[in-house]
């Protein structure tokens, strides 16, 4: 098991280093000049001002030297200074990251609450109309893009086109310390938008795993002994079927971080993803690199932990 964990940790480190390299290259290949962006001019800029600012930002150094400085800084926890916000990148990310993690965490809880019981129920009702409805809904849930679902929720629940008598807030953020009620009210729509697609994936995996467990010899033997169906399901089938489901939940937790990029911008939720889009528009190299690095690190770390957990639960994969 020790060697298995070391392999997974080593793979994660290599992947993270590869991501850092690719991100640096792609950011510096972006069209547009951050210096001209900061000076606020694209035509006839003052050459002296341009060169002075370029030197100040370190953009006049050879590209390999810039890369080496960024890697060394990142290893020391220093991702540089944001061009647009004039503060350390880590400080800017530190303000936004908890909001993104909160959104992803709440969405995952909702996805599990929706997906797990529906998956078990769908397996129990296999071949019936209710199973067809649930599997069709799951297929739709996995195929509808996050931003489309977000705008549909805004139209239905914020514009109140069906005259429910209330309108949900469609954008913005309220600090929980100032108004907890308003905070959670503004969290509902983006969290459900993220949750539904994940819930559909969890439901399909749960259904598949439960069906496989139901067809096993051990379950048939328990039924032959006269055990009631709900006891067979709750005490034996669910426990055996949930190892691949736990893996799916862990993998989807990593995917949620990517899903927040669209969701946060649809609902104007001030998390890490909206900061990333803002930094791209500003050609803020250090902030772009920092945001992508942190999001990638979360994704890679989550996948590594899921693999290790799966290895603990199922020794065959070690």
Predicted regions and their residues:
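An internal, D/E-rich "acidic patch" concept
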Residues: 59-116
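Membrane-water interface segments at the C-terminal ends of transmembrane alpha-helices
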Residues: 23-29, 58, 72, 136-169, ...
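Alpha-helical transmembrane segments of integral membrane proteins
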Residues: 2-3, 97-130, 146, 175-318
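N-terminal signal-anchor/signal peptide hydrophobic helix marking the start
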Residues: 6-12
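Transmembrane alpha-helical core residues of multi-pass small-molecule transporters
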Residues: 11, 19, 42-43, 110-111, ...
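Hydrophobic aliphatic residues
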Residues: 30, 38, 42, 74-75, ...
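Hydrophobic alpha-helical transmembrane segments of membrane transport/permease proteins
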Residues: 16-68, 162-183
């Amino acid at each position: 098991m020790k060697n298995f964990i070391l392999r997974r940790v080593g793979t994660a480190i290599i992947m993270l280093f590869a991501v850092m390299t690719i991100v640096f290259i792609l950011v510096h290949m972006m069209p547009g000049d951050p210096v001209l962006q900061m000076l606020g001019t694209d035509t006839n800029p003052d050459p002296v001002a341009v060169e002075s600012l370029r030197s100040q930002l370190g953009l006049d150094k050879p590209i390999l030297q810039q890369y080496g400085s960024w890697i060394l800084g990142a290893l020391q926890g220093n991702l540089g200074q944001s061009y647009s916000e004039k503060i350390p990148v880590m400080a800017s990310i530190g303000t936004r990251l908890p909001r993104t993690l909160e959104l992803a965490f709440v969405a995952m809880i909702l996805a599990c609450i929706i997906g797990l019981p529906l998956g078990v129920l769908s397996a129990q009702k296999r071949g019936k109309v209710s199973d067809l409805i649930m599997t069709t809904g799951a297929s739709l849930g996995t195929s509808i893009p996050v931003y489309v679902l977000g705008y549909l929720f805004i139209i239905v629940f914020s514009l109140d086109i069906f005259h429910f008598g209330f309108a949900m807030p469609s954008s913005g953020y309220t600090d929980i310390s100032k108004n907890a009620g308003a905070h959670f009210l503004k969290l509902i729509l983006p969290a459900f938008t993220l949750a539904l697609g994940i819930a559909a994936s969890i439901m399909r995996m749960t259904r598949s795993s439960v069906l496989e467990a139901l067809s096993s010899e051990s379950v048939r033997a328990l039924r032959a002994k006269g055990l009631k169906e709900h006891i067979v399901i709750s005490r034996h089938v669910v426990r055996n079927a949930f190892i691949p489901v736990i893996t799916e939940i862990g993998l989807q937790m990593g995917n949620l971080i990517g899903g927040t990029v669209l969701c946060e911008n649809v609902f104007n939720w001030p998390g890490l993803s909206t900061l990333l889009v803002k930094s791209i528009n500003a050609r803020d190299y250090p902030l772009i690199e920092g945001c992508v690095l942190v999001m990638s690190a979360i994704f890679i770390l989550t996948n590594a932990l899921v693999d290790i957990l799966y290895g603990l639960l199922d020794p065959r994969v070690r």
